[in-house]
Amino acid sequence: MGNLAKPDSVARVTNARQRGLEIKKLQEEALAQLPLNTLYIVLYIRSDPPRANDFHWGYYFHQTTSGGSKYHMRNLGGGWIPDHGPTSGVFKSNFLCVLIQIANVPEPKHAILDQTMRSRDDDVNQIPGVTCRIWLMTILQRLIEEGLVRCDDHQKLQDECMMFGNQYSATAASNSQPRPVVRSKLCK
């Protein structure tokens, strides 16, 4: 008799499974609704409760209805390493806060985008004061120079991203789904 589940514990498990399936469906729908060939700055909260202006920064480039490419740097204690590659799970990432659309990249320029994203992989730890945010801003400057992102002031874009991150961090901590997608007002 000790192995029999109590009815309320069964209900909790069933509700948790249903909630998990609902979240998965919402995430898949959100991914499919992203416009193709769009580039995003992606912010993740680093703590719960979230702290203001404290995010992990990365890029996401949406190429198909089922996914795209992630570009970001990870700190392994002794330095930063690239963590780029295909993903179908941008909305499934733990602590995802917000996606901020910054550009549409036409298909003929996809290779240039990928090369630019990887352009500092070999010397990332030589970027002064490198963090994921500083790497992202360094790459952003190159994306602007390449004409892939049209933004007049990358510092104001960083501030705008912080504002969006702070706005949505509490709902990220409570795992409200799907996570918001916004468009930068500073990028053309």
Give the positions of each predicted feature.
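Activation targets extended, charge/polar-rich intrinsically disordered C-terminal tails
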Residues: 119-188
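Non-catalytic ligand/cofactor/substrate-binding and regulatory segments of enzyme domains
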Residues: 2-131
